[in-house]
Design a protein with these regions (language model features):
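Divalent metal-dependent catalytic cores for phosphoryl transfer on phosphate-bearing substrates
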Residues: 1-129, 185-194, 236-240, 259-266
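Cyclic nucleotide signaling catalytic output domains
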Residues: 312, 327, 674-678, 688-700, ...
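Cys/His-rich short segments
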Residues: 380-495
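Catalytic/regulatory signature loops of cyclic-dinucleotide turnover enzymes
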Residues: 332-342, 371-386, 663-669, 689-714
Length: 851
């Protein structure tokens, strides 16, 4: 990145810093002036320093028009970048009316980005807090909390401390971005009482910096040096020119890559493969940004195998994108024989496509739909002539087997570099041989949940002694990914092979700049800190007395219709200006918000750190003092995959639903599949069947549903499929139906009126009748055998009569049970819910040692 473009980017990142100052001091002055005064104390007297101050001081039209600046002053670029990022012109500057009224309210907190997304709802707000991995999550709430002057003063002191250590003009672009993110992510950009305060100051300044860098690159390529003419005098006309380029990338083959494993060491391998994909995509993004001479300010979104980057629409940029895609895919073919593929699409767009205020001539383009179509087209013709020639040439580097090469026992790729698989079970009698990639992925899964190893480095060549390094595709060929210690980083930097660093969950501090990568690395551990394996997770189901079927729960879930919602969510057709909220900063804020939920907040939900007013959900008794016995295998983008003790996983799933509803203000829903399996069953088959359950839930009208393990008797008795649920026997419910009807009504009724061994069987009370497991089985089988609203009432009545107690004091309770069972049995939906409730009860009553 050239010095001038870098300066424009930093000016964009700092242009509104005065908003913090004005809210911290309550001075009656424009925020642009206060911001320039604040930053001045950290600068020298060079021309670059003076230029930065002019950008901050004159980024509004009123001041800029009378400043008498040269036509090539960057202040004109920042002015236009600010307008485009905010999505409108003629905005009042904070501080304009401080002496005339209460138009700006510095007490306002950040609104939830979902307040104006896809329909009306009661607004929710975020408290003013920093972004910290060690603290509890900042959930939105319905109360308009107050952002205090003292809180803003604290933010101001934090920036002052950092800027005194290193001047902002001397910082790397990504370093400055990180400082702003830490403190400004929950600070509202605007406190104008006539506007929605749903864009954070961080998101707005980030997008302003990104837009400024794009404008500078575009003008440089076209030889434009009259910034005043392009960005100020004739900016309205130029907003209809396709200056910008939205770049989207998407990994294909993710499912096949993740689940192509053996049962030995399955948990670590799953976690390692999922994390590898995350870092591989982050590395691709950094390779692309480096080739485009841009920073992470231009990264709109990166998670779940997808990314969006805002760049300049020039031939140079489009050629660079094609070149990066080609080189990355060459590396992926070499490493994984085409299992993974990166599809990239580009869509030119103009400033008016990014702004709320378009003129009447311009027809606004739906950016994300258009670029998604380009990505889909790229997937239809994967490779260019160079890669195809290699693939079809049996003597090429891709196809030629080295002398002595053998097939890897995990991925089945032939190589001459095999060694014992690190996931081999001791004393198992088999020695699986694995390639360096598969063994490296196993080590990566182990390192991911090691609290002492939170930094991962990409090296340009394999360092001496780094046996656990994994090859990763890059523009320069293959690079190497490995967990790192501070000493390692220093050694590799001195050797000149350290390319970049990724910091897991923001816990790394050093002189080396690292990109933060939020990871939901929750894993249940035993008393000595060892991560539970599949068998131990299944064993931890139920209670500690041996009750509760020993089964592993598997959950797969993703957001319902997120793609369509993302495309249309900010478009309100009933409004005079339907696209008033469809601004670049809002899409960036929405993307960041979703990524933060699935990569960071999900970990807090696993730890039962829930919004105020939401208590952890339990199927049976409360386990408030115990952590959830679950593992996050993968969580990112808009989907997740977890395994765990089946009852704990069910509790987590309901917690997730409730928290997601709060987080998105009820605007988005998700559907899930949850299956129960023997811990020795094939993990790839578990994932496949649970994925089918997830699809079944999504096929329910309105989606917003959960599909549970099969409800047929063969589920209990047929062990040939490892206890896997058959899709046709699954029970599908909306979340409200499951929470309120299955659990809130049926399960609770059974627990309150029956003595159930393993649940409440030790409670000898005359308001509960004894009910054995075999009798409950017979009742459940009769209910399952009914068709529609037709029921064999005679057989049902006979079986139900077996519950009738001899003791008179239990008669009233029996009559309640009999009456309620009849009511539920004759109605199809009620009967289905009762069957599911009985299933859960029976699973909880079964002994762990039962098959």
């Amino acid at each position: 990145m050239s010095e001038k473009i870098s300066l424009a980017l930093k000016a964009g990142l700092l242009h509104d810093v005065g908003k913090v100052c004005i809210r911290a001091t309550h001075e009656r002055q424009r925020h642009s002036i206060l911001g320039a005064e604040f930053i001045r104390s950290f600068l020298a007297d060079t021309e670059a320093d003076k230029q930065l101050l002019r950008c901050i001081k004159y980024h509004h039209g009123r001041e800029l028009s009378g400043a008498g600046l040269d036509i090539d002053d960057l202040a004109y670029v920042i002015y236009e970048a600010d307008n485009i990022a905010a999505g409108a012109d003629r905005r009042e500057a904070e501080g304009d009316l401080n002496d005339r009224g209460a138009k700006f309210d510095s007490d306002l907190c950040l609104e939830n980005i979902f307040n104006v997304f896809s329909g009306d709802a009661e607004p929710s707000y975020f408290s003013l807090r920093e972004l910290d991995a060690m603290k509890k999550e900042n959930f939105p709430h319905g109360n308009k909390s107050i952002a205090t002057q003292g809180q803003y003063a604290s933010i101001m002191r934090y920036m002052e401390k950092n800027f005194r250590m290193k001047s902002p003009i001397s910082m790397e672009e990504n370093e400055l971005l990180r400082i702003l993110e830490d403190k400004l992510i929950y600070v509202p950009s605007s406190t104008n009482t006539e506007e929605h305060a749903d864009i954070s100051l961080y998101d707005h300044m980030k997008m302003t910096g990104a837009t400024a860098a794009v404008l500078m690159k575009y003008m440089k390529t076209l030889g434009i040096t009259d910034y005043k003419g392009f960005c100020f005098t004739h900016n309205k006309e130029n907003r209809n020119k396709d200056v910008f380029l939205m770049i989207s990338g998407d990994f294909s083959g993710i499912q096949k890559f993740i689940y192509h494993i053996r049962s030995e060491g399955a948990m670590r391998m799953l976690r390692g493969r999922s994390f590898y994909l995350d870092i591989a995509l982050e590395n691709i993004v950094d390779e692309l940004l480096n080739a485009l001479h841009l920073s992470r300010a231009n990264l709109i979104y990166c998670s779940g195998g997808h990314f969006y980057i805002l760049a300049d629409n020039t031939k140079e940029t489009q050629d660079a994108v094609k070149d990066v895609a080609k080189k990355i895919n060459q590396g992926l073919v070499k490493l994984f024989s085409g299992t993974l593929y990166l599809a990239i699409g580009c869509e030119p767009l103009c400033a008016n496509d990014l702004m709320a205020e378009s003129d009447t001539v311009h027809h606004k383009k739906n950016i994300f739909r258009s670029v998604s179509e380009k990505v889909s087209m790229a997937k239809l013709s994967r490779y260019g002539p160079d890669i195809l020639t290699e693939l079809f040439n049996e003597n090429s580097n891709v196809n030629r087997a080295d002398q002595g090469a053998r097939e890897c026992g995990i991925c089945h790729i032939s190589t001459d570099r095999l060694s014992s698989y690190k996931g081999n079970r001791p004393n198992a009698g088999t020695d699986i041989q694995a390639c360096e990639v598969c063994n490296g992925l196993y080590d990566l899964g182990k390192a991911l949940i090691d609290d002492k190893r939170s930094v991962f480095a990409v090296l340009s060549e394999k360092a001496e002694g780094s046996d656990r390094a994994i090859p990763i595709s890059a523009c320069s060929g293959l690079c190497w990914l490995t967990a790192a210690s501070p000493d390692d980083l220093k050694q590799w930097a001195e050797a000149g092979i350290l390319k970049r660093i990724y910091d897991k969950n923001g816990s790394y501090t050093s002189s080396f700049m690292a990109s933060r990568l939020w990871v939901a690395d929750y894993a249940a551990k035993n008393e000595i800190g060892k991560v539970l394996d599949f068998n131990e997770l299944a064993e931890s189901s139920g209670d500690k007395t041996g009750k509760g079927i020993k089964r592993l729960g598997v959950l797969r879930a993703d957001v319902d219709g997120l793609g369509a919602a993302f495309i249309a969510g900010f478009i309100h057709k009933e409004n005079k200006n339907p696209e008033a909220y469809a601004t670049l900063s809002r899409y960036a804020a929405l993307s960041r918000s979703m990524a933060l939920f699935f990569r960071k907040i999900i970990k807090g939900i696993c730890k039962k750190e829930l919004p105020e007013g939401i208590k952890p959900f339990y199927l049976f008794e409360d386990k408030d003092g115990e952590p959830r016995k679950i593992h996050v295998v993968y969580s990112g983008g808009d989907d997740l995959f977890l395994v765990g003790a089946w009852d704990d996983l069910m509790g987590f799933t309901v917690d997730l639903k409730r928290v997601f509803s709060v987080y998105t203000n009820g605007k988005l829903t998700f559907s899930a599949g949850l299956g129960l399996y023997s811990s020795t069953y094939s993990i790839s088959r578990m994932a496949e069947v649970t994925g089918e359950l997830e699809e079944l839930a999504k096929s329910n009208p309105g989606k917003n549903s959960i599909a549970l393990f099969g409800s047929g008797t063969e589920y209990h008795r047929n062990e040939k499929n490892g206890g896997a649920a058959e899709k046709e026997n699954a029970a599908v419910y909306t979340w409200d139906e499951f929470i309120e009807k299955v659990h809130g009504e049926k399960i609770k009724f059974l627990m309150e009126h029956m003595l159930l061994d393993g649940i409440n069987g030790n409670s000898k009370r005359n308001d509960r009748i004894p009910a054995g497991k075999s009798l409950l089985y017979r009742l459940m089988n009769l209910l399952q055998g009914a068709a529609g609203d037709r029921m064999d009432l005679a057989r049902f009545a006979y079986t139900l009569a077996r519950l009738k107690p001899k003791e008179k004091e239990w008669q009233p309770c029996y009559e309640k049970v009999r009456s309620r069972f009849y009511q539920w049995a004759v109605k199809e939906e009620e009967r289905k819910e009762l069957v599911t409730a009985l299933q859960f009860i029976i699973y909880r009553m079964r002994d762990k040692e039962e098959a």
